[in-house]
Amino acid sequence: MVRRLTPVVLAAALAASVAGLAGGPAYASAGSRPVLSVGGEVTTAASYTAEQLAALPQATATVTVGGRQVTDTGVLLETLVTSAGPAYPASLLNTKNELLRVTVTVRGAGHRQVTFAVGELDAGFGNHPALLALTQNGHRIAHGPELVVPGDRAPVRFVPRVSRLTVGIATTPATDTNPAAGSPVEIIDGHHHVTLSAALLARLPAETLPVSFLGPSGTQTHTEVGPSLLTVLAAARIRPTLSTWVAAVGLDNYVATVTPAEQLVGGRPLQLSLNEDGVALAQPRLVTDGDVHGGRYVSGVVDIYVGTGPAR
């Protein structure tokens, strides 16, 4: 069965991405050699030939390229992650929404690399899918699978000749569950550790963001006020790339991952809210505007872990 995604008009720059497929090795004509490997923190690592990928459930996305529409068909990125099965450590078994800790890093031609939070891709949360395209307008893409992200504003996260998917899982240390109200937020990026006080966060440029999402009791609508996640990272002197992931940790040790690229390229605001519906929050809240479900909203944020490539 072919699943059809919502048609999206992309910037004309997509033409450059399509043109970039020229050159490099083509598919083996018989399709007998693997063209894609899936590994990392998975229960079942796998390699796929072109024919094996084509035999998986297919989805289509219609986009506009240079004023003309093209239709890409292939495998949803999340399908391949689900098939491999994230290998959660014992400490995360039976953890609420453990899928929201999972990332997948896509690598292609010229060592080009892009990381996604699986929560962004999942239809129950972010509902912003990515597609490993195998054909375009019914014709096989000659030089191997191409990653396309139909909902993005521009083809910045598109990856030609994809050869490797690496799954990662954000495993963060337990937080202090009894901090005082207005405790600072700790930003941890490897050996780079920055403390952002409540006063400093309050001085950062703030945005007002009306949001709506599904919660346990139905649709919730709020007005959030606070700095964007990009502004918070800049305050910590962190410059994100397309491979950067961020894991927000709440007072209850609830964790959800996002990527700055969701806002930079996908146009979906990410915010560290300090005020909700006119009431100051005791601790910041991660807000993921555009998600259909509020699972990636993290209340009482005390720690923010930042990494590049597969989460760990």
Residue spans for each PLM region:
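N-terminal intrinsically disordered, low-complexity segments enriched in P/E/S/T
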Residues: 2-3, 27-312
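Secretory targeting and sorting signals
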Residues: 1-28
